[in-house]
Amino acid sequence: MPRSRINGNFIDKTSSIVANILLRIIPTTSGEKEAFTYYRDGMSAQSEGNYAEALQNYYEAMRLEIDPYDRSYILYNIGLIHTSNGEHTKALEYYFRALERNPFLPQAFNNMAVICHYRGEQAIRQGDSEIAEAWSDQAAEYWKQAIALTPGNYIEAHNWLKITRRFE
């Protein structure tokens, strides 16, 4: 039974019903419908913290999905899981891949900036100010891109850029 049919709460059930109706009425190929089903099941598993199951669904969705824009969101969600698991190098790889297909994902730029900022903080704790500065500069570049795409969002990042004199 697809995961979408076993969701427990009202909102999940409603979303699943709407998604199933859309899948029936929107003219798509069976492969696209199957890819969307795997993607939807991946999001459901991810929201429940079942990351291994979510990854399986996302990888299957990637195998079937041909649209670059849709693939960007699958890749982004895979990046989120790797971020949650502390696998920052893998997460960055998936965020990059998502942005190659869709350069208008401010959340990917933000998450990349957060990882770089975290690595900069780690370098400071280890006493390596040169490496810390490089990571912080990279974080600044990613945050600038996120802010440029969605002005008014990422207020804390905007303030950090001003405080550290990295905002142009």
From Swiss-Prot:
Membrane topology annotation: Peripheral membrane protein
Places the protein is found: Plastid, Chloroplast thylakoid membrane
PROSITE patterns the UniProt entry points to: TPR, TPR_REGION
GO biological process: photosynthesis
TPR repeats: 35-68, 72-105, 120-153
Sorted UniProt keywords: Chloroplast, Membrane, Photosynthesis, Plastid, Repeat, Thylakoid, TPR repeat
Matching Pfam families: TPR_1 (PF00515)
Signal peptide bounds: none
GO cellular component: chloroplast thylakoid membrane
Function: Essential for the assembly of the photosystem I (PSI) complex. May act as a chaperone-like factor to guide the assembly of the PSI subunits.
HAMAP family attached to this UniProt entry: Ycf3
Assigned protein family: Belongs to the Ycf3 family.
Name used for this protein in its record: Photosystem I assembly protein Ycf3
Organism, scientific name: Drimys granadensis
Gene: ycf3
